[in-house]
Amino acid sequence: MPAKLSVNLNAIAMLRNRRDLPWPSVTGLGRAALAAGAAGLTVHPRPDQRHIRFSDLGDIRALIDDEYPQAEFNIEGFPSEAFLDLVEKHEPEQVTLVPDDPMQATSDHGWDFMSKADFLAPIVARLKGRGMRVSLFADPDSLGYERAKAIGADRVELYTGPYGATHDDPAAAARELDRLEKAARAATALGLAVNAGHDLTVDNLPALVKRIPQLAEVSIGHGLTADALMYGIPVTVSRYITALAG
């Protein structure tokens, strides 16, 4: 089964927030993505609400519950108490925990599982106790994956930023694919499902899914939104689903 596509709405929200206006509509374009075949919607709410606003979460939750109950809501972020309160209020199917400073521009590294296991363990238990699947953002080096499994994570999301950055360097892309494949195999051997995200496009997805056929889900926002400016959401989502099929 091809990996599922979760459309990250942050870039749409950032465009909306350039003006004090309700468009482009985050939920409206999320609806269009789901109608076109996306399996879910992802958001990364940050403390300053510079893209996704806290008020968006209830609207997205209602959209999925009322119109696309088979779809999944994925909320990602650093597990501060404020973030955990938001997550518990809106009950996403999946929570992706990332280690970044809430004020940085974007996630750019995975957890240090060896040093952060004691910090993460009670948080993972808390979320799973509420029925949420937990994915941990991970560098593609397999270091500490056994600790991620031991503290109860269901999945790891492989950080694919370095792979995305090799768009004009085939040799470097091959090296990054080797790293990602090795990391995915290590995670799978431990019983962790594998997600991936960051700078994925219709051009680099086919090679990735060929090397990681067990990939469960990709979360894509920036590249997909850029393509949607040219082709529209329905066509763009269809193109990404085709790319995921290899």
Swiss-Prot record:
Gene3D superfamilies for this protein? Aldolase class I
Q: How does it assemble?
A: Homooctamer; tetramer of dimers.
Q: Name the species this protein comes from.
A: Brucella abortus (strain 2308)
- Positions binding 3-amino-2-oxopropyl phosphate in this chain are 8, 19, 199, 221-222
State what protein this is by name.
Pyridoxine 5'-phosphate synthase
Purpose: Catalyzes the complicated ring closure reaction between the two acyclic compounds 1-deoxy-D-xylulose-5-phosphate (DXP) and 3-amino-2-oxopropyl phosphate (1-amino-acetone-3-phosphate or AAP) to form pyridoxine 5'-phosphate (PNP) and inorganic phosphate.
Question: Can you tell me which residues form the catalytic site?
Answer: 44 (proton acceptor), 76 (proton acceptor), 198 (proton donor)
Record GO biological process = pyridoxine biosynthetic process
Q: Could you tell me the gene encoding this protein?
A: pdxJ
Concerning InterPro entries, the annotation shows:
Aldolase_TIM (IPR013785), PyrdxlP_synth_PdxJ (IPR004569), Pyridoxine-5'_phos_synth (IPR036130)
Q: Which residues bind 1-deoxy-D-xylulose 5-phosphate?
A: 46, 51, 106
Q: Which PANTHER family match?
A: PYRIDOXINE 5'-PHOSPHATE SYNTHASE
Q: Which pairs are disulfide-linked?
A: none
Q: Does the keyword Cytoplasm apply?
A: yes
EC number(s): the record gives: 2.6.99.2
Write out the annotated subcellular location: Cytoplasm
